[in-house]
Amino acid sequence: MAVFSSLTPVFVAVLCVIIGFLFKNSQRKESRSKQKPSDQTARPWVDEDLQDDTEISTKDNEENNEDWMDTTDEENLPHVPYSPVQYSVSEMLDRSERFYTLMNLRRSVRFISPEPVPKEVIDNVIRTAGTAPSGAHTEPWTFVVVSDTDVKHRIREIIEEEEEINYKQRMGNKWVQDLKRLRTNWVKEYLDVAPYLILVFKQAYGILPSGKKKTHYYNEISVSISCGILLAALQNAGLVTVTTTPLNCGPQLRSLLQRPANEKLLMLLPVGFPASDAKVPDLKRKDLNDIMVLV
């Protein structure tokens, strides 16, 4: 009995070591399972540079009141009569059908000609994009137009380096497989060839000449709407592009183009005429009944 009593602390110690080992081993396995998601549960990788607090709460403004603009100065904004052009029913039908026909020809074109494009045309399509509605009319967009050969090539280098990582590591097998039929990869030759690159930045908040910040409500939605109008303006001008969302390239491109910290890259559009040998996938659009619900 005395021997058993003397051995009891030893048994307890050994038992504690075994339990501790088993617990630690189970934690290690659980950690590995979390770090390596299966193909079934993997989700498309998200651009972390765009993950910011775009909606400023009242509490945030109260805590940092001195840093933010007082909007009471704009309360007496004058209002003016609005009288748009009105068309007859037949004119409305004709204009809407012709515009649809024009836009239905729009395609994502990755084969772009180096043929020069008049700068005035680019000015006009950017000006048109700037007519988009925005939260509280903050117009939270910046369109950086690049035509310099060296800068375009540096942009290509940055994007291709990150895109190769995206395709091989971040995007996941399902995303990569879904893109195979479109024959896309991380090589972006059009970034060198296109006469212009338009980089669209959203302004997470505004910065006034006084240094104070201005709240930009729904800035990403507002800038996305302006991108849609920009695509329509390019199509109307007879130009082509392909919508490019260079994941994880925002900080490097922002630095290259010397943009402030409040601007986040949302989209990049190479712009020009289609190459003479340009090809696009033979895709069909959804029928009206598949995209519209009438209540």
Curated annotation (Swiss-Prot):
Tell me its cofactors: FMN
Name of the protein this chain belongs to: Iodotyrosine deiodinase
| Gene3D superfamilies from the UniProt entry | NADH Oxidase
Query: Which parts of this chain are annotated as the region Disordered?
Result: 29-81
In the record, the note on similarity to other proteins reads: Belongs to the nitroreductase family.
What reaction gets catalysed by this protein?
2 iodide + L-tyrosine + 2 NADP(+) = 3,5-diiodo-L-tyrosine + 2 NADPH + H(+); iodide + L-tyrosine + NADP(+) = 3-iodo-L-tyrosine + NADPH; 3-iodo-L-tyrosine + iodide + NADP(+) = 3,5-diiodo-L-tyrosine + NADPH + H(+); L-tyrosine + chloride + NADP(+) = 3-chloro-L-tyrosine + NADPH
InterPro entries in the record: Nitroreductase, Nitroreductase-like, Nitroreductase/BluB
The membrane topology term of the UniProt record is: Single-pass membrane protein
Keyword Electron transport recorded:
no
The lineage is:
Eukaryota, Metazoa, Chordata, Craniata, Vertebrata
Task: Name its species.
Answer: Danio rerio (Zebrafish)
Where does the chain cross the membrane?
3-23
* Alphabetically ordered keywords of this record: Flavoprotein, FMN, Membrane, NADP, Oxidoreductase, Transmembrane, Transmembrane helix
